Every structure is written in C-alpha cells, then in structure tokens.
Design a protein with these regions (language model features):
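Beta1/beta-strand and adjacent pyrophosphate-binding region of the FAD-binding site
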Residues: 2-15, 32
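Flavin-dependent oxidoreductases
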Residues: 18, 177-293, 302-310, 392-416, ...
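Glycine-rich FAD pyrophosphate-binding loop
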Residues: 24-44
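Central beta-strand plus flanking loop segment that forms part of the substrate or channel wall
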Residues: 48-53, 89-91, 217-242, 302, ...
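Dinucleotide-binding Rossmann-like beta1-alpha1 core, especially the glycine-rich loop
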Residues: 49-128, 255-260, 265-268, 401-413, ...
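Flavin (FAD/FMN) cofactor-binding and adjacent substrate-gating region
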Residues: 73, 94-165, 170-171, 176-184, ...
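C-terminal catalytic lobe of FAD-dependent flavoproteins
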Residues: 255, 264, 286-424
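Glycine/proline-enriched, intrinsically flexible loops and inter-domain linkers
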Residues: 377-378, 382-809
Length: 809
C-alpha cells in the first residue's frame, strides 16, 4: 500500500469511485480510494439503480444529465458492463395540483435543453405503460432519458477507469483516525498503516458521520430505511414487452408515493412512505456491510394500496422479495458537497441518495474544486455550506424524517415546512406572532413572511392565495407612509485590524468607502463571476461591517476565512444572531427615526449611504441610510438584548404615521418594482458583473488587484453572454416564482430567476436572463406559466422611483 498521496478518498461506493475517476481525468495520478470492506458495501449494492435528469434545481439537473451521458465513457474505458436500461419514464399525476407541478417541470426542461420531454394524456401514458389504470390519472410527463443501471457494474466501472488512469484503490482498508499537521497535510491512519495526504475526501456514505467525527465535525446526515419489493414474473410484463418491443418504462406515481420499473420478468416497486423510520440514528456500526434490514410490509401498506389501485396488475402478482436497506439523506434531501468551512483540504461528498443520477456530477464538481479551486458549475443546491451550525443531530433527524416522508409530495411556492421549527427566534418573535406573523425558516431563524388577520392563514397553491391581499397592504404601507421590517436574518460580518482596508480592497471589487459611508460591494471569483453581493460600511479606518445574504452565511464565511492573511492583521467575525436588526422604510421613515434619537438624521446630516453609530433612546445602534425596499429607509443594527426596546420605540413613534409591520414577501414585492436582484436568484456564481448589472459597482480602475479583476475586465470587453432583465407579465391569477422559460418570437431564449406581484405598482413581474443580443428587444416576449404562454413586456426602468429621487431624499 502506498504511504503518500495527493488525495485520499474515503469510501468505495459509487460516489467515492466517481470522485476518484474524475480526479484522474484532471491529470491527478497520485490519488487513492480506501474502502473498509468491498466496493459497493453500504448503500450502493442494494440500490434500485434508477437514473433520471429531472431535479428541482436546474443546476443539479444539468449535473444529472452529465452523469447519464458519462456511463458509456466509463463502460468503454473500463470494459466493465454496467447493464444500462434506457427505458424512458413517465411521471404520473392523479390530481390537477400535481399536473400543474408537472407542467412547471416540463417548462423548466425547455430552457435546460430537455427537448424530448412531453406533457401527455393518461391515455398516452397507458400506451407507453400498459400496467397503469389511466382512469386514475389526469395527466403525465414523458421523459425518454430515464432508466436504470447495475450498481455493482457502475461502481466498478468508475474504479477500474480510475485505476487505468493511474489511481489506486484498496479494499478491506479501514480508516481508523485522521489528524492534521501544522503544514496542513493529513495523516490517514488505517488498519494497514498510515498514508500522508494533502487532501481528504469524505465519501463514506453510511459512515460519513463517523469520518466527520474523526476531525470534530458533526455532519447533518441521517440514514433512513428504504424498502422496495420485487414481484414474481408477471404475464402483464411479458405482454407489455411483446406489445412495445422493449422493457416496461419507469414510472413515478407521486400520489401513490411509489416508483416502479421492470426487473427481469417481473416488476420492482419502491415506496417513500409517510411512516418512515431512521436507521442507526446516533452512529453506524462499522461491521455493517452487505446486509439488509428486516422488512416491514405493514409500514408501506398504505402506499402499496394506492399502488395496486393505480397499477392493477401488481395486486395479482406474487411478491418474491422485499428489500429494506439504509440510505443517507441531508435535511433537504440534496447532497453535501464541497470544502468544509474552517478546515484545510477536508472535503465532503456525502448524502448523495440519488447516486446513480448524481454521482457523476458530484465527482466532476468536487474534482474540479480540488484541482482548480472551483467546482466549474453552480452547485449551491449541493454545497455543504448551505447549512449552519444549528444543524445538530436532533434537527437533522426531524428534517430528514420530514423530507423522506414528503419526497413525492408537492411543495407549493408559498408552503413552509414545519419540522425542526421553531428553532432560532429573536426577542420580538412573540410580538410578531401576536401581530399575526406567518413565519418561514431561513438558515434556522424564524422570519416573518407576512402578517395575517385573525382567522386567516396560508392556503397552499400554485396560484395567488390568502396572503395576496395582505402582502399588498404591507407593501403599500411602505410606499405611502412607513413600514417596519425584521432584517435579523441578514448575514453580518465584522472585518477589523490593521490590514482590514487593504484586505477588503482585494476581496471586494468595489472601492472601499470612506469612514462614515457605505457602498454596494460585489465579490468575484478568480474567473470574474459573482460569488457575493454585499453592503460594505466603513465605521472607522480599521473597522468595517459587511451585510449580506443570510442563507449564504457559511458559504461566504468559508470564502473569507480561506483568503485571510497568515500574519493576524485581519480578523473576520460572523455575528449571526449576536447582531440583529430592523429596517424602517417609506416616506415617513425619517420622521419615525428622528422621534427616537437626539442625533440629527436629516438628509443634510445623514444622506443616502451614510452610516454611523448612534443612540436610539437608550439603545446603542449602528444605523445605515439604506433600504432594500428601494425607498427612503434605514437599517438599524443592535445587540440582541436591545431588540425588543428598539421595536417598541419604533412602533410607538410610528403610531401617528400608521406604521405597519411588513414581512419578507412584501419586501420581495418592493424590490421587484425597483429591479433589485437578490443572492441565490439573480446573483449566482455562474454570472458575471456585466451580465448581472452589478458592473456599475465594480471599480475596474482601482489600484488594488482585486480577486477576479482580470476576468471582470475581460467580461467588460466582451460584453458577456447574458443580461439580467425585468419584465412586466400579463398574469391573471398566478405569478412566476423562478425557473420558467422566457421566449422571444416563439423560441425559448432564457429563464426566470424570480418573480411575484409588485403590489404598489399593481403588476406581475419577473426577472431573468436572456442573451445580450436580445436584451434591448422591446416586443415578442412571452413567459410560460402553468403550461400557458403569457405576454411579457421588457421593463428597463424601475416601476417605482425610476430616478431614485425618493430613495436618495
């Protein structure tokens, strides 16, 4: 066994083998994979092996497309048969609500290049899949790029291909401990000796928690029991094979919470049952391997009952075997991929429950990241940094149970899931709740979404719902008088030290503002793409406050920490809920603030983008003259023990102005009519500054060689490929939410990033990306919503305060 390697991959399942192979594709030869038993031990060997391209996140869908296209390559290179069955598949809808969801998936596929997707009738679905009862369904979607593979064959094809490219892998080699030297290298202690490595990849599957704990890391991963049954040979299968000349196609029956495919002369039926059960909640036994769990048919009986009704032939079939095996899940069901914050060269490739759809993409992204410093794709939906320190074992358990039980359930755009909540709250939570706040969870924190009158609550729908009118009241209150919003969920970072100014000048693409001033601050990757957008406030020569997206706190903190100088001249602190805040916004915002402080907050004394410390009554605060509403407004930041007092002061001082609380949904409506983008929607690491419109905040000519400068200049010279545009949409009873296709002259040319109803302006709006050549085209635009083409109008100027006069007043 080798005693030194550039990368050691821990875990010999499909994901670890894919990572190993992709490292060799990038020229790495000094790489090793370690497996405690045999390849595929754990979850891989008993998987159903299904593969499909459809995913709720379009960027993950692209990686799934890549995975499926990769199979021929590794089969040819390795000589290992992977037994691919490209049968095609149907997604079945038994209700109109589910059919609406399928129409959205179909629309998303159009801009992803999935041109072969079809929305079909139940009768057509029956022609493709004779085993269904078409009377049980209202519609379906057909995808020809769907099927299944042999888990053993795929894993060995990856491993053999990697070995042909120069890698090594060792079975029956158990990792017993990990330790890191001061120079950053790792000691990998195994039952066969020690290996020195530059990088560690945790692809340990069922043992991901154990490998994490070796370095003091508690990964948010939980294994769930998952069952599928295999039938005896069925005459209906033989008849369907003869009739169609091919295997029975795959099917997902969402309302039955089941999936089916052919297995030899019979069928396989798997369930995601409501009465789900975790497996080995605290730790995974090291001796577990090629073993199965005791099946519990009573637990899946409700799903089977629906399945037998929807697929009548199953009721007549004999059950040959019930497979019950554990699979790992993260709290939201997506993988945990990427570098771990605060650790040097420790990488995660865990919780990949759809390994035969996603394994290739995960391996590609992680190999790119290790070798090139960037995944090469937008992998936010899989990035381990999307979770914070709040994801302990109890939280993970609650969320994974919920996610598993809802895997085939509809998630409506206005639906907030309940598991693991409430967890983090501010001191004004009870006040907000008493005022009718309907909460959502953002990065673990309870955030008011909207305020409901007594007796009114969210009714989940693809269309405008019970919140619509009340969000409008909140938004109009901001525009007409004054509103008070909770911004405690924003991310807050302090940057201090003798080297803080110079460090920020390199980290951020903007000019560092003078003391007492703020600026909008794009942050770029090495290639010039956007990796963050912030507000930067200069409190003194060596003390700065950065405000950013709350959901990206770990993501951005990881970037900050990885770029800190080693001399101790810069300190970066993430405040989380140690600094909380409120925003006052609207034409009367200044009057309310002035009534609460002896400081002069007039326009002359505190103009737009000014910032300073001041006392608000008895509360010491940092106040910035800025608002995401695009109106006259302020952001007020305080220590958490002062938040209740601050809230009460503003509500009392604002009573004469009919101050109204507003939530995140009203804030979204207000920012849309200002053409403001947001992180995770309009601003993601696949877009450049020119494409996003953030180039106006990039100081291309400043002396500092900021990260991404060369790439940003190159994009400015070329013009990039895309443009972020705003549209007014001729919508009737529903509004876009994101990922709908944008067409011009009847051809799909772009995609929606976000949207909603701009209540104060009285129109439905969308933001999205289109080719730069079309960005000035005024007519011919349409956006697809619920399988209907809606006319849209390019909205170049903001609908509200186009010249920013009120925002700056």
């Amino acid at each position: 066994m080798k005693t030194q390697a550039k990368v050691v991959v821990i875990g010999g399942g499909v994901v670890g083998a894919s990572v190993l192979y992709h490292l060799t594709k990038l020229g790495c030869r000094d790489v090793i994979m370690l497996e405690r038993s045999e390849l595929t031990s754990g979850s891989t060997w008993h998987a159903a092996g299904g593969m499909h391209t459809i995913n709720g996140d379009p960027n993950v869908a692209k990686l799934q497309q890549y995975t499926i296209k990769l199979y021929k390559e590794i089969e040819d290179l390795s000589g290992q048969d992977i037994t691919m069955h490209m049968t095609g598949g149907v997604m079945l809808a038994a209700t109109e609500e589910r059919f609406d969801w399928l129409k959205g998936v179909y629309a998303k596929g159009k801009y992803l290049g999935m041109d072969d997707l079809e929305i079909i009738t139940p009768e057509r679905a029956h022609e493709l899949l004779p085993l269904i009862d078409p009377d049980q369904f209202v519609g379906a979607m057909y995808d020809p790029i769907e099927g299944h593979v042999d888990p053993y064959g795929v894993t060995h094809a990856y491993a053999k291909s990697a070995r042909k490219n120069g890698a090594e892998y060792y079975t029956h080699t158990k990792v017993e401990s990990l330790s890191q030297e001061t120079d950053g290298t790792w000691n990998v202690e195994t039952n066969k000796g020690t290996i020195k490595a530059e990088h560690i990849v945790n692809a340990a599957g069922l043992w991901a928690r154990e490998v994490g704990r070796m370095v003091g890391l508690e990964l948010p991963v939980l294994a769930m029991e998952h069952m599928y049954l295999l039938t005896e040979d069925m005459p209906e299968v033989a008849e369907a094979n003869a009739k169609t000349g091919s295997e029975v196609i795959h099917a997902v029956d969402f309302d039955g919470e089941i999936y089916v495919r052919q297995e030899r002369g019979g069928m396989l039926m798997g369930t995601y049952e409501k009465a789900c059960v975790p497996w080995s909640e605290r730790e995974t036994p090291w001796e577990f391997g090629h073993q199965l769990l005791e099946p519990d048919i009573d637990r899946i009986a409700p799903s089977l009952e629906v399945g037998f009704r929807h697929f009548p032939a199953f009721e007549r079939a004999g059950i040959k075997q019930i497979i019950n095996g554990p699979f790992t899940f993260a709290p939201d069901g997506n993988p945990l991929v990427g570098p771990v914050k605060g650790m040097t060269n420790y990488w995660s490739a865990c919780a990949v429950m759809a390994g035969f759809s996603q394994g290739g993409g995960v391996g590609l992204a992680l190999a790119n990241w290790i070798v090139n410093g960037d995944p090469g794709f937008d992998v936010w939906a899989m990035d381990i940094s999307r979770f914070g320190d709040y994801t302990n074992m109890a939280y993970t358990n609650a969320r994974v149970r919920e996610n598993y039980s809802r895997r085939f359930s509809i998630r409506y755009p206005n639906e907030e899931l309940e598991a693991g909540r409430p967890l983090l709250t501010t001191s004004i939570y009870d006040r907000q709740k008493a005022a009718g706040a309907q909460f959502g969870a953002s990065y673990g924190l309870e955030v008011p979404l909207w305020y409901a009158p007594e007796g009114v609550k969210d009714e989940f729908s693809w269309r405008r719902s019970t919140d619509f009118d009340h969000i409008g009241i909140e938004a109009k209150a901001v525009r007409d008088s004054v509103g008070l919003g909770d911004i405690s969920g924003f991310a807050k970072y302090s940057v201090s030290g003798a080297g803080a100014h110079a460090w920020l000048d390199r980290m951020l693409a903007c000019n560092v503002p003078a003391v007492g001033r703020m600026t909008l601050a794009p942050m770029l990757k090495d290639d010039g793409k956007i990796i963050g957008d912030f507000t930067l406030a200069s409190l003194s020569d060596d003390d700065f406050l950065i405000i950013g997206s709350g959901i990206a706190e770990s993501y951005h903190m990881r970037w900050f920490l990885s770029h800190l100088p080693n001399d101790g001249s810069v300190t970066v602190t993430s405040h989380n809920l140690e600094l909380v805040g409120l925003t006052l916004a609207g034409p009367k915002a200044r009057d309310v603030l002035q009534a609460c402080t002896f400081d002069d907050v007039s326009h002359a004394a505190m103009p737009f983008m000014a910032v300073r410390r001041m006392d608000i009554g008895m509360v010491p605060a940092i106040v910035g003259r800025v608002s995401y509403t695009g109106d006259l407004g302020y952001e007020i930041w305080v220590k958490p023990e002062y938040l209740s007092n601050l809230f009460d002061q503003f509500m009392l001082a604002g009573a004469d102005h009919e101050i109204r609380l507003f939530g995140a949904r009203a804030l979204n409506a207000l920012r849309l009519e200002k053409n403001f983008g947001s992180w995770g929607r309009e601003y993601r690491p696949i877009y450049g500054a020119v494409e996003t419109g953030l180039d106006r905040f990039v100081a291309y000519d400043k002396d500092a060689d900021f990260i991404g400068k060369a790439g940003a200049i190159a994009e400015r010279e070329s013009g990039g490929k895309l443009r972020l545009c705003s549209f007014v949409v001729d919508a009737k009873d529903a509004d876009v939410i994101g990922d709908e296709p944008i067409s011009n002259a009847g051809k799909v040319v772009g995609w929606v990033t976000s949207g909603g109803f701009a209540h104060a302006s009285g129109v439905s709006m969308a933001q999205g990306y289109v080719p730069k050549e079309l960005a000035d085209k005024s007519d011919g635009w349409q956006i697809e919503l619920l399988n209907e083409q809606l006319d849209a109008r390019l909205q170049r100027e903001p609908l509200f305060d186009a010249n920013a006069g009120r925002m700056r007043s």
